[in-house]
A protein has these predicted regions:
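Enriched for short, Lys/Arg-rich terminal
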Residues: 2-6, 13-17, 57-59, 63-97
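PIN/NYN-family metal-dependent endoribonuclease catalytic core
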Residues: 7-8, 36
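A short, surface-exposed loop/turn module that caps and links secondary-structure elements
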Residues: 30-54
Length: 97
């Protein structure tokens, strides 16, 4: 199955806060996720949501809907887990119906 990567409207603001090295790591991991997004452990409480460790303190959380991989948030560990449900909810309201 071919997956398409999409981004939550707030995601690029998250990227702006990261260092160049962190962004480079994200880009590499994004390609791995695109090839096999289900390889990671499912997040509890988040239907079809998964997490990827970018660094020891930075997490990427994404959501899979059909062939689309929605990048929800990339931020420090605690903030990423605290905010991803809000972004998932807003994504469902705006794009997924």
């Amino acid at each position: 199955m071919e997956y398409k990567v999409r981004f939550h409207s707030e995601f690029f603001k998250d990227l702006d806060k990261l260092s160049a090295i962190d962004i480079e790591i994200f880009e590499k991991k994004k390609e791995k996720i695109k090839q096999n997004p289900l390889r990671l452990k499912h997040l509890s409480g988040g239907e079809n949501c998964y997490r990827e460790e970018i660094t020891t303190n930075i997490r990427l959380i994404y959501y899979i809907k059909g062939n689309d991989i929605w990048m929800l948030i990339i931020d420090k560990h605690d903030k990423a887990y605290a905010e991803y449900r809000k972004r998932l909810y807003s994504l469902r309201l705006r794009h997924l119906g």
